[in-house]
Amino acid sequence: MLHDMLAAVQGNAARYFRTKLFRMQNRAPIVSFTFDDVPDSAYTNGAAILEEFGVFGTFYIAAGTCNTKGAYWNVISPEQVRVLHDRGHEIGCHTFSHADLKKLSAAETEVECRKNHNLLRRICGDVQLTNFAYPHGHVSLRRKLQLQKRFDSCRGVIQGINVGTIDLGLLKVVELFSRSLTPEKLQRILQETCDHNGWLIFYTHDVTNRPSEVGCSPSLLRSTIETVQAMGLTCVPVRDALRLIGYPVA
């Protein structure tokens, strides 16, 4: 019980202490589409739909889970990861085993990231993992401070648009979930992004006609991209969005 209480305090600290501040310098609003865990449908449907519109996404992969089966989806295969990379999509880090970072030491976290990078380099060749997403959205303040040094950005699951001076240690997102993203909400969020010259990061998981609670249908993904492009918004992966906001990407 005490351990759980301490973990909750650490998690709240990670959320409320902005630790990697950067003032956005983008000239126009930005939208990024990201996929966590990467079910195989995010490859077969998600990536294919993005490519229909000339859009590239960021796919946060825990390579140790490739080819595994869960309660809601089958995880992408190593070959599919390689194809995503070869087609120009960004591969992001999601730890090796989709670990709960609140429960890991600094050494264990480093091993998770190193193993993931090493395996993805064997799969993809020259891939560089420069951006990270916290598995389950969980992170302690200590692990946040550790990971923000290793990666250009770390993304969570806290809802919101990234505007003005942002925390690159805990980027905000908007759920691209069929259960929660209505046309009215989409229009409101996109208008807010335009009004504040923001960076809107969508995140989802599976892309199927019967999505999980944390996934979306192909029609929702397609209509979202259509709406974004109709408003003239720039759609780029996280790595390219960082350049557009003026972050000194290597």
Please place each PLM-identified region on the residue numbering:
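Active-site beta->alpha N-cap acidic-glycine motif
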Residues: 4-90, 117-122, 128-134, 191, ...
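Generic enzyme active-site microenvironment
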Residues: 32-35, 92, 203-204, 235
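Catalytic domains of cell-wall/extracellular-matrix polysaccharide-remodeling enzymes
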Residues: 45, 50, 69, 98-194, ...
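Residue-level detector of anion-binding/catalytic polar loops
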Residues: 56, 90, 153, 199, ...
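Histidine-centered catalytic micro-motifs
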Residues: 91-98
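C-terminal active-site rim and adjoining tail of enzyme catalytic domains
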Residues: 193, 203-221, 238
